[in-house]
Amino acid sequence: MSNTNGSAITEFILLGLTDCPELQSLLFVLFLVVYLVTLLGNLGMIMLMRLDSRLHTPMYFFLTNLAFVDLCYTSNATPQMSTNIVSEKTISFAGCFTQCYIFIALLLTEFYMLAAMAYDRYVAIYDPLRYSVKTSRRVCICLATFPYVYGFSDGLFQAILTFRLTFCRSSVINHFYCADPPLIKLSCSDTYVKEHAMFISAGFNLSSSLTIVLVSYAFILAAILRIKSAEGRHKAFSTCGSHMMAVTLFYGTLFCMYIRPPTDKTVEESKIIAVFYTFVSPVLNPLIYSLRNKDVKQALKNVLR
């Protein structure tokens, strides 16, 4: 881990989203507001579901975990990003490792938390008579624990592979947080193992979690089409509508980043897309789930009385 003159790299420089002073001031205010709204929204959702006993169900148990992951996700990047805008743009080697590790871990955790939520909706609509058995407290705890254990295990493995590389080309990271791809570009050692491990992990986790979601919704759609009454179909659709919107928002931004041909993927475009799944998704999820959910809206009214 040394630079071109042989001295050890003890810190990195994060270039951020822009080097324009006027835009930096605007971005600081914008992301500070977004972060505060994210904190308020996700903490509010967690507290609401803890306080109202009617929301002590498997669906809201998973939603509480999703809100917690989103809260940690945006908190991992925003404070450092805001600090870099108003002061020095540096981050220590250990700080960069920690941020990279937590980012990967929480990204993977969210993949499988959304998959667990899709399974919950599948059981509720496709097999309602066995819902209490298939989503017992023990099952729910296992389904919610797996994303954290797997996400933080694979995240640690990926982060260790990255920071075992030798960094000698530069200490400047063209991003607003310590991300794997720009870090790999700074390495002057062989990145074959790391690049392939990253590709395999990204491909497997994205495809496997999305497959669980799509298969679950295929069964849900089949069950809904068998419902004869229009009111029953509408109720079933509304039950999983919020989750479908959250999945579309989260996976949609990731596909925009990785599905395009490599020639079209500029660094600046990648940073802008990263803003969406780092900041936009966490701030919108509480709104999506509260505005389309009668139980949440009623619980909020009860608390505000």
Swiss-Prot record:
GO CC term (a single one): plasma membrane
Q: How does it sit in the membrane?
A: Multi-pass membrane protein
Q: Which residues lie on this side of the membrane: Cytoplasmic?
A: 47-54, 120-138, 217-236, 292-305
Q: What is its main location?
A: membrane
Keywords (A to Z) from UniProt: Cell membrane, Disulfide bond, G-protein coupled receptor, Glycoprotein, Membrane, Olfaction, Receptor, Sensory transduction, Transducer, Transmembrane, Transmembrane helix
- Family matches, as InterPro entries: GPCR_Rhodpsn, GPCR_Rhodpsn_7TM, Olfact_rcpt
This chain is glycosylated at 5
The subcellular localization recorded is:
Cell membrane
Molecular function in Gene Ontology: G protein-coupled receptor activity; olfactory receptor activity
Question: Which Pfam families does the record cross-reference, listed alphabetically?
Answer: 7tm_4
The intrachain disulfides are 96-188
Residue intervals annotated with topology Extracellular: 1-25, 76-98, 160-195, 258-270
- Membrane-spanning ranges: 26-46, 55-75, 99-119, 139-159, 196-216, 237-257, 271-291
Q: Which SUPFAM superfamilies match?
A: Family A G protein-coupled receptor-like
The similarity annotation says: Belongs to the G-protein coupled receptor 1 family.
Role noted for this protein: Odorant receptor.
Entry protein name: Olfactory receptor 5M11
Mind giving the lineage of the organism this protein is from?
Eukaryota, Metazoa, Chordata, Craniata, Vertebrata
